């Protein structure tokens, strides 16, 4: 969880930090915790994060998950680049099933989220017997519910959506 003092000093000079995901994603929450006064830029893919990171800009990539192991896409993109790793952060991930404010868990027919989240919650989802739809990130899956306008679709993301009155946490700690 710690980064070296040398890295901290060097990081004062960065302009932007790129991350994969939408506002409200786990990656953004890591950035807010460790770098509260920097500019964050959303990316749809790990490849985009790596392409944007460089001397004046940093990128944040998830590289390992205690439930499903290595985040292979992150590693592959990092290895193919000439970037250096400057620090490591640990973030406890607690997924929740989230629907629109009037949704009921027994009516959910389709669940959308990042492929890693779908895999991490596979036991819970198997018991639900629902259609799974991978999308580019967890927070984005919940935000997309507003466009879908269906109470039969849910997303998997962090429990912090509980405070947003547009959504309802249908099940915590899945």
Where are these regions (language model features)?
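Domain-level signature for soluble enzymes in the chorismate/prephenate branch of the shikimate pathway
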Residues: 2-174
